[in-house]
Structures are given as structure tokens and as C-alpha cells.
Amino acid sequence: MVAVAILAAGKGTRMKSQLPKVLHRLGSQTLLDRVLASLTPLNVDRCFVIVGYQGDRVRESWAHRTDIEFVEQTQQLGTGHAVQQLLPHLKGYQGDLLVLNGDVPLLRGETLEALVSGHQRSGAAATLLTAQLNQPKGYGRVFCDATSRVCEIIEDRDCTPAQRQNPRVNAGVYCFRWPDLEAVLPNLSTANDQQEYYLTEAITYLDPVSAVEVADSQEILGINDRLQLADSFRILQERIRQQWMLAGVTLVDPTSITIDETVQLGTDVVIEPQTHLRGNTVIGNNCSIGPNSLITNSQIGDGVTVQMSVISDSTIAANSKIGPFAHLRGAAAIGEACRIGNFVEVKKSTVGDRTNVAHLSYLGDATLGQRVNVGAGTITANYDGVSKHPTVIGDRSKTGANSVLVAPVTIGQDVTIAAGSTINKDVPDGALAIARSRQTIHENWSTPTTEQ
């Protein structure tokens, strides 16, 4: 059995933000989201989040999770004091307690799994996660006895110059045998530089204490300011990019590309520079995406090309070509082998297979059939100032350049709309619709000038 305590009560003053530190986003998730997600491999009995500064906002962000118990730390008097708040909640509990910090978002689930399983195999009263750092400044140092058992943890600010030379640091992640920790928590003191209750002091009262060293020291990096937040984002993206390149995806200029963990990519996909893939985006096989494109929560079929475009909450079927400079949004659905070209916006519309919308058009609340050709400058005028109205264009119909379709309106199959027309009435199948003023010519016209 293992219970979990996530320490999330700090003010995070170095973030210089009105937002609680654990609610700052690292990619697609908050810091607290990521810490909670790392618990997935574990069989957790109870999960506590200890809150303090702006605790109500932290609670609100996870109000949908009934498996999380929030515990208030009204005064921020140190990590030991935070865990003391669990005493009334875990009275009589006989399992282990895993303690994490809410601002250490890069820990992998398998690392926590190794820590907990190692602790339970060893029979130790406490097991801590450690790392070897080339620049350990700011981290507590871990000191072991001749048998390699942990005997002391000294916070960086309390270390002597000689003690600061020790590269083995405390990651701030612990697994305790709860009955043992419960017995010593009341003994913690504030006899230190910060006059706080350090959880690390409990180590001096417990025996035996073991350690598990993390293989990748980047996992333990904490976030205290915006610089560290940016550095953690870089590390996270390196992980994701490496994963996809090893899986058969080509990333041209990888450091200019960002990909959320929730994105799924097929094989032989090429991602060009300055492309950003977010949310629950799925991209099929043999696609070329970018450069300079943003795709969010969208499904892209096999063989699709996207250039310099913004796509959100939309679907694109196989072998279609999007862009450059297209904008698809609001549940746009593009069929197979379509072309959505330069400066075209498609919003809440369905475009049938092999339909071309090549340039300078807006399709809103529209349904287009198959093999439709939309001329340059065609606009669906879908909004009357109060409500949105639909436009329907049947199979194989064509709209001439600079046409305006005033919704609600239905264009039948095999219809031709003459260039420059403003259509505000339904057009039957097979018809030619012309709705423009007749051209007149005045020969020998003298253009007026301002000269008298």
C-alpha cells in the first residue's frame, strides 16, 4: 500500500506571478498536472495535495477529481510542517507514504515506481531519491555512512563550504514507512537557518534509511522562476522529439519544433521548421507538415500536406493539400484529395472529396459536395448580425471569382455561379446563376479632373 503527498503550498514568489506556481503550464499541462500524471504506474491508496497560498485556485483546477484529497497548510513553515498536516488524515494507516514536490514536473512514472518498489524490497524506514549533479547549488546534500546507508541530509543554505562540495543531492522525493514517520514527525524542530520544520530532519530519527539514485538527473529539476520553467520545457521537448525521431518521424531543425505528449504521429511524417503540434492532434502516415504551421486538436489523414497554416479542432482526410496561409477551425471537415489554398478560411464547414478552394475565400457554416470548385474571392455571408445561417453547394458546382453567397442559400448540383455574382436565392441543379449589374460602356469618356 502507498499513499501520496504532493507539497503544493508554497507562494512561488520568484515566479513573480499572481498564479500559484503549481498552476503554471509546462507545455500542455500544469506543473501539478504533470506530477499527478507521474503517479500512473503506482497503485495509490490515497492521494493528498497539500495547499496553502491561493489554495482555493488549486482546488478548483482539480475539482473534477474525486480521488484527490486537499489538505490545508495555513502557515508555510517548511516541508516537515506540511507533512505534519497529514497526521489526522492517516491515523492508523500501515502503508508507505510517497512525498513529492508539486514543482518538480519532469519525474518519470518509472522512476517513482523504482523508488517505491526499491523501498518496499529493502525494508527501510525511509528511502530517498538522489542524483549526482555537476552544479548542486540550491539542493540539500546527502551524506552516507561507511555502509552506504543515508545518515544525514543537510540543506544547501546550512552546509559548510566543505559539505557543499558533495555532488550527491536530495531530489526532494521520499518514500517513508508511515508508522515510523508518524512517530517522529512531532519531534521536528526549527533549529536551522530558515527556522522551518524540515522533513529531512526525520531522516536522522529513522533507521535504516536507503537511497535510490535517478539515472537522469534532469528529472529532479525543480521550478522556482521563469528561467527554470523555460529550461524544463526545453528538456521536455527534447524527450518528445527524440521519441518521435526514433519512431520514424523526420524533424527538420528539431529545436524549432514543439510537440505535445498527447500528439500522435504516423510513420514517414516530415515536420518542417517552426511547426507546433498541440493537444490531441493525430497525423497519419506520409504527411508533410510545415514550415510555420500550428495544428491543435485535429486529425490529419495519410498523405496530407500542410504549409504555413493554422488548423484547430478540424479533420482533414487523406491526400489533401492545405495552404499556404490557410486557417481551418471550429470543426472544419475536409474530404479526400481536396485543396484548401492561399488565404482561405474554413469554419464549421464540411468540404467534400476532391473539392478545390484555391484562394482568397471564406467558408463559414457551409456544406460543399464533391468536386466543387470555389473561385477566388468567394465568400459565404453567413451572419446577419444576430444568427449564423448555412450555405449548401452541391456536387460539381462552380462559383466564379468574387462571388458572394448570402445565407441561408442552397446551390444545387452542377451549378455555375457567374463571377462577381451576389446570390441570395436558391439555385436549382444544372443552372447558371448571374446576379450582377449589366456592364455599360461610355466611349470617348473624359475623366474629370480637379483642374478647371
From Swiss-Prot:
Q: Which UniProt keywords apply?
A: Acyltransferase, Cell shape, Cell wall biogenesis/degradation, Cytoplasm, Magnesium, Metal-binding, Multifunctional enzyme, Nucleotidyltransferase, Peptidoglycan synthesis, Repeat, Transferase
One GO BP annotation here?
peptidoglycan biosynthetic process
**Coiled coil regions in record:** none
Q: What is one Pfam family matched by this protein?
A: Hexapep
Q: In which pathway does it act?
A: Nucleotide-sugar biosynthesis; UDP-N-acetyl-alpha-D-glucosamine biosynthesis; N-acetyl-alpha-D-glucosamine 1-phosphate from alpha-D-glucosamine 6-phosphate (route II): step 2/2; Nucleotide-sugar biosynthesis; UDP-N-acetyl-alpha-D-glucosamine biosynthesis; UDP-N-acetyl-alpha-D-glucosamine from N-acetyl-alpha-D-glucosamine 1-phosphate: step 1/1; Bacterial outer membrane biogenesis; LPS lipid A biosynthesis
Q: Which HAMAP family match?
A: GlmU
Subunit and partners: Homotrimer.
Compartments where located: Cytoplasm
The EC number of this protein is: 2.7.7.23, 2.3.1.157
> Which residues participate in UDP-N-acetyl-alpha-D-glucosamine binding?
7-10, 21, 73, 78-79, 140, 155, 170, 224, 329, 347, 362, 373
Q: Does the record carry Membrane as a key word?
A: no
Q: What is the purpose of this protein?
A: Catalyzes the last two sequential reactions in the de novo biosynthetic pathway for UDP-N-acetylglucosamine (UDP-GlcNAc). The C-terminal domain catalyzes the transfer of acetyl group from acetyl coenzyme A to glucosamine-1-phosphate (GlcN-1-P) to produce N-acetylglucosamine-1-phosphate (GlcNAc-1-P), which is converted into UDP-GlcNAc by the transfer of uridine 5-monophosphate (from uridine 5-triphosphate), a reaction catalyzed by the N-terminal domain.
- The record lists Mg(2+) as bound by 103, 224
Q: Where is the active site?
A: 359 (proton acceptor)
Organism of origin is Synechococcus elongatus (strain ATCC 33912 / PCC 7942 / FACHB-805)
Main location as per UniProt: cytoplasm
Cite the residue spans of the region called Linker. 227-247
Here the disulfide bonds are none
The record's comment on cofactor binding reads: Binds 1 Mg(2+) ion per subunit.
- Family under the similarity heading: In the N-terminal section; belongs to the N-acetylglucosamine-1-phosphate uridyltransferase family. In the C-terminal section; belongs to the transferase hexapeptide repeat family.
Task: Point out the gene that encodes the protein.
Answer: glmU
Where would one find the signal peptide in this protein?
none
Write out the ranges of the annotated region (Pyrophosphorylase).
Answer: 1-226
Q: Name one GO cellular component term.
A: carboxysome
Annotated region (N-acetyltransferase) at 248-452
Name listed for the protein in its UniProt record: Bifunctional protein GlmU
Binding of acetyl-CoA, residues: 376, 382-383, 419, 436
One Gene Ontology MF term: UDP-N-acetylglucosamine diphosphorylase activity
